[in-house]
């Protein structure tokens, strides 16, 4: 989302949450999107990739933080990003780990630091059997 009107359009067709990517927005633009989402009673998942973006998101009082483990310059994924940033996030915030999650061990490592929400795309999209892949991911994970 880059224009508040997109939020209004999204709400009109039933959306209840928007994605605000700090890497592509100024603080002013992000604030405008967050305010518009709140005005339209929508949640906002504020996505960060590093500590600088996290600091900016927190300064905007974001409460739903998505930590994207994918480096946008190299497209390399590393869940250490989530593990490193989680302790810097206040307990009042809900954290979603995004990208690079492909095993139940990954989810366990994240769960052990208090992250219990995950955005999993690529590993499931590449799976021949999505149901079996999802079951394998969740086996042994206590959420």
PLM regions and their residue ranges:
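Glycine-rich phosphate-binding active-site loops on the catalytic face of alpha/beta enzymes
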Residues: 7-29, 67-75, 113-134
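Catalytic beta/alpha-barrel core
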Residues: 1-3, 16-27, 40-54, 66-76, ...
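Catalytic cores of alpha/beta
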Residues: 2-13, 49-60, 97, 101-120, ...
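Short, hinge-like loop/turn segments at secondary-structure boundaries
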Residues: 14, 36-38, 62-65, 83-84, ...
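Glycine/Thr-rich beta-alpha phosphate-binding loop at enzyme active sites
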Residues: 58-86
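C-terminal helical cap(s) of enzyme catalytic domains, especially alpha/beta-barrels
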Residues: 84-88, 111, 126-143
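Short acidic, glycine/proline-enriched helix-loop-strand junctions
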Residues: 40-42, 92-93, 138-139, 143
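Catalytic alpha/beta core domains of metabolic enzymes, predominantly
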Residues: 82-86, 90-96, 103
């Amino acid at each position: 989302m880059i224009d508040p009107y997109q939020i209004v359009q999204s709400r009109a067709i039933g959306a209840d949450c928007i994605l605000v990517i700090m890497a592509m927005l100024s603080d002013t633009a992000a604030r405008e999107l967050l305010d518009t989402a709140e005005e339209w009673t929508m949640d906002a998942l504020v996505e960060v990739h590093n500590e600088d973006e996290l600091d900016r998101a927190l300064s905007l009082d974001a409460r739903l933080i998505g930590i994207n483990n994918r480096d946008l310059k190299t497209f390399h994924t590393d869940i250490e990003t989530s593990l490193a940033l989680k302790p810097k996030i206040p307990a009042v915030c809900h954290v979603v780990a995004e990208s690079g999650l492909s095993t139940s061990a990954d989810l366990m490592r994240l769960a052990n630091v208090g992250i219990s929400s995950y955005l999993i795309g690529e590993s499931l999209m590449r799976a021949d059997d999505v149901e079996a892949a999802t079951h394998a991911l969740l086996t042994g994970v206590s959420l």
